[in-house]
């Protein structure tokens, strides 16, 4: 898949592309590992990546995701993929804004 790590707040999260039983992706904070099923459709994969990144963000910001709930986490975090898919100009603008300067 090309991406094998994610950096967040000075922490390295190892990204492993493999099927996990009974889920599409999972973040394990005990070993800073994110597993994602590589055989997902691209639109589903984007939603799962945003969803799991939300788990990463909550964990490293000491936010109890159980208070938010898995259903709300899914509903809200996965909408980034929907917005970006339906707004290519916005996606390009964000990419330009985040692009590293040489």
Which residues are covered by each model-predicted region?
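Metalloprotease/metallohydrolase-associated module, dominated by Zn2+-dependent proteases
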Residues: 1-44, 60-102
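Active-site recognition of the HExxH zinc-binding catalytic motif
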Residues: 47-59
